[in-house]
Amino acid sequence: MKFSTVILAAGKGTRMHSNMPKVLHTLAGKPMVKHVIDTCNNLGAQNIHLVYGHGGDQMQQALANENVNWVLQAQQLGTGHAVDQASPHFQDDEKILVLYGDVPLISEDTIESLLEAQPTDGIALLTVVLEDPTGYGRIVRKRGPVVAIVEQKDASEEQKLIKEVNTGVLVATGRDLKRWLAGLNNNNAQGEYYLTDVIAAAHDEGRAVEAVHPSHSIEVEGVNDRIQLARLERAFQARQAKKLLEQGVMLRDPARFDLRGTLQCGSDVEIDVNVIIEGNVSIGNNVVIGAGSILKDCEIDDNTVIRPYSVIEGATVGENCTVGPFTRLRPGAELRDDAHVGNFVEMKNARLGEGSKANHLTYLGDAEIGKGVNVGAGVITCNYDGANKHKTVIGDDVFVGSDCQLVAPVTIGNGATIGAGTTLTKNVAEGELVITRAPERKIAGWQRPAKKK
């Protein structure tokens, strides 16, 4: 179904108390307006006209990778005026869908229903019935059909009793919408050009006006302050959690889980409380994710356990691995099958081979570590010389004792042993033992200093 979209995103959002344009505030880690843009792209919108005003530079920087037509509304004179700024770009015979950058949860199904409901010579709008309609434009019907929308400030006492309200979302052909917009005036309580007045214009011409309801009222809730944004965040997360539970993922507490990207899960996955998923994350079968862990743009293979409070970003973890607690895997980190990293271990651009382990207090950066290696507590790969990064290569079956510093570039051959406390600056051959320590001294009869009285 061919259509183009106008997204209204020019509002300042005063009640957000922020220097950032309202629509750039994030929901599930993504700007609200980006949710709307993505929905339009998923539905195959031919053109997306983004009407902006306040914070234009910030908007264009944040959405630099989006294929949108930027339309400036220099003065905020109402929703009708905003849409009219984009009207020169409308094709006469195309459907024009009007959406809002601060209404991020509208679904593809609801939009498709609205597009399908639009009469050939008329207009379709999205309405919702609310128990408390205060503040919304009321839908005025005459013996069934919609004949007008009356804003709260212009409504009579009788009209204020109406519970069916306008969401602002509508669709009409470009030719009709341009004509109706050209006929708007600002003779109302707010002195603005209301988009809603096009409904009365359509009715006056004898055009059909169809009303469609969303699947759920949360889809059309807008954001004017941080309280409303927080409410939508929880509603969105509840929806995401429900989908995962239906797919068989065990969320220990769905109310304490945040998905801020996409998650693919195998079978029998268990996710404990306060876990955050960001970017694109893939989790295999029989995986356990411990409480408080953060996973971003990473892959976790089958039968692996991520213990509590681990942070994994841009990393790959193989099968039957154990990570954490309190482990940080940074971009480029890779654990091969059966590898183990424990508490306060950090890896960056490093590979830990099959069956190898670094269980305590270790930094492995720019390193390639073979199979069956034991990395003792307190080991550091010294990869940075103040100007450039250098690589550490450790072969198979190497034992690195506690509190060693491996000053890169350095290579350790298969089966070598590095004694505890060693500062290694030269390559080590296969099977060698290397120890660098100051001579041990014993002082007999030594007395500790006495405390002053």
UniProtKB/Swiss-Prot annotation:
<dbReference type="GO" id="GO:0006048">
    <property type="term" value="P:UDP-N-acetylglucosamine biosynthetic process"/>
</dbReference>
<dbReference type="GO" id="GO:0016020">
    <property type="term" value="C:membrane"/>
</dbReference>
<feature type="binding site">
    <location>
        <position position="22"/>
    </location>
    <ligand>
        <name>UDP-N-acetyl-alpha-D-glucosamine</name>
    </ligand>
</feature>
<dbReference type="GO" id="GO:0000287">
    <property type="term" value="F:magnesium ion binding"/>
</dbReference>
<feature type="binding site">
    <location>
        <position position="402"/>
    </location>
    <ligand>
        <name>acetyl-CoA</name>
    </ligand>
</feature>
<dbReference type="Pfam" id="PF12804">
    <property type="entry name" value="NTP_transf_3"/>
</dbReference>
<comment type="similarity">
    <text>In the N-terminal section; belongs to the N-acetylglucosamine-1-phosphate uridyltransferase family.</text>
</comment>
<feature type="binding site">
    <location>
        <position position="137"/>
    </location>
    <ligand>
        <name>UDP-N-acetyl-alpha-D-glucosamine</name>
    </ligand>
</feature>
<keyword id="KW-0963">Cytoplasm</keyword>
<feature type="binding site">
    <location>
        <position position="151"/>
    </location>
    <ligand>
        <name>UDP-N-acetyl-alpha-D-glucosamine</name>
    </ligand>
</feature>
<feature type="binding site">
    <location>
        <position position="330"/>
    </location>
    <ligand>
        <name>UDP-N-acetyl-alpha-D-glucosamine</name>
    </ligand>
</feature>
<feature type="binding site">
    <location>
        <position position="224"/>
    </location>
    <ligand>
        <name>Mg(2+)</name>
    </ligand>
</feature>
<feature type="binding site">
    <location>
        <position position="348"/>
    </location>
    <ligand>
        <name>UDP-N-acetyl-alpha-D-glucosamine</name>
    </ligand>
</feature>
<dbReference type="GO" id="GO:0019134">
    <property type="term" value="F:glucosamine-1-phosphate N-acetyltransferase activity"/>
</dbReference>
<feature type="region of interest" description="Linker">
    <location>
        <begin position="227"/>
        <end position="247"/>
    </location>
</feature>
<dbReference type="GO" id="GO:0000902">
    <property type="term" value="P:cell morphogenesis"/>
</dbReference>
<feature type="binding site">
    <location>
        <position position="374"/>
    </location>
    <ligand>
        <name>UDP-N-acetyl-alpha-D-glucosamine</name>
    </ligand>
</feature>
<comment type="similarity">
    <text>In the C-terminal section; belongs to the transferase hexapeptide repeat family.</text>
</comment>
<feature type="binding site">
    <location>
        <position position="363"/>
    </location>
    <ligand>
        <name>UDP-N-acetyl-alpha-D-glucosamine</name>
    </ligand>
</feature>
<dbReference type="Pfam" id="PF00132">
    <property type="entry name" value="Hexapep"/>
</dbReference>
<feature type="active site" description="Proton acceptor">
    <location>
        <position position="360"/>
    </location>
</feature>
<dbReference type="GO" id="GO:0003977">
    <property type="term" value="F:UDP-N-acetylglucosamine diphosphorylase activity"/>
</dbReference>
<dbReference type="InterPro" id="IPR038009">
    <property type="entry name" value="GlmU_C_LbH"/>
</dbReference>
<dbReference type="InterPro" id="IPR025877">
    <property type="entry name" value="MobA-like_NTP_Trfase"/>
</dbReference>
<keyword id="KW-0133">Cell shape</keyword>
<feature type="binding site">
    <location>
        <begin position="100"/>
        <end position="102"/>
    </location>
    <ligand>
        <name>UDP-N-acetyl-alpha-D-glucosamine</name>
    </ligand>
</feature>
<keyword id="KW-0460">Magnesium</keyword>
<feature type="binding site">
    <location>
        <position position="73"/>
    </location>
    <ligand>
        <name>UDP-N-acetyl-alpha-D-glucosamine</name>
    </ligand>
</feature>
<comment type="pathway">
    <text>Nucleotide-sugar biosynthesis; UDP-N-acetyl-alpha-D-glucosamine biosynthesis; N-acetyl-alpha-D-glucosamine 1-phosphate from alpha-D-glucosamine 6-phosphate (route II): step 2/2.</text>
</comment>
<dbReference type="InterPro" id="IPR001451">
    <property type="entry name" value="Hexapep"/>
</dbReference>
<dbReference type="InterPro" id="IPR005882">
    <property type="entry name" value="Bifunctional_GlmU"/>
</dbReference>
<dbReference type="InterPro" id="IPR029044">
    <property type="entry name" value="Nucleotide-diphossugar_trans"/>
</dbReference>
<dbReference type="GO" id="GO:0009245">
    <property type="term" value="P:lipid A biosynthetic process"/>
</dbReference>
<keyword id="KW-0573">Peptidoglycan synthesis</keyword>
<keyword id="KW-0808">Transferase</keyword>
<keyword id="KW-0479">Metal-binding</keyword>
<dbReference type="InterPro" id="IPR011004">
    <property type="entry name" value="Trimer_LpxA-like_sf"/>
</dbReference>
<feature type="binding site">
    <location>
        <position position="166"/>
    </location>
    <ligand>
        <name>UDP-N-acetyl-alpha-D-glucosamine</name>
    </ligand>
</feature>
<feature type="binding site">
    <location>
        <begin position="78"/>
        <end position="79"/>
    </location>
    <ligand>
        <name>UDP-N-acetyl-alpha-D-glucosamine</name>
    </ligand>
</feature>
<keyword id="KW-0548">Nucleotidyltransferase</keyword>
<comment type="function">
    <text>Catalyzes the last two sequential reactions in the de novo biosynthetic pathway for UDP-N-acetylglucosamine (UDP-GlcNAc). The C-terminal domain catalyzes the transfer of acetyl group from acetyl coenzyme A to glucosamine-1-phosphate (GlcN-1-P) to produce N-acetylglucosamine-1-phosphate (GlcNAc-1-P), which is converted into UDP-GlcNAc by the transfer of uridine 5-monophosphate (from uridine 5-triphosphate), a reaction catalyzed by the N-terminal domain.</text>
</comment>
<dbReference type="GO" id="GO:0009252">
    <property type="term" value="P:peptidoglycan biosynthetic process"/>
</dbReference>
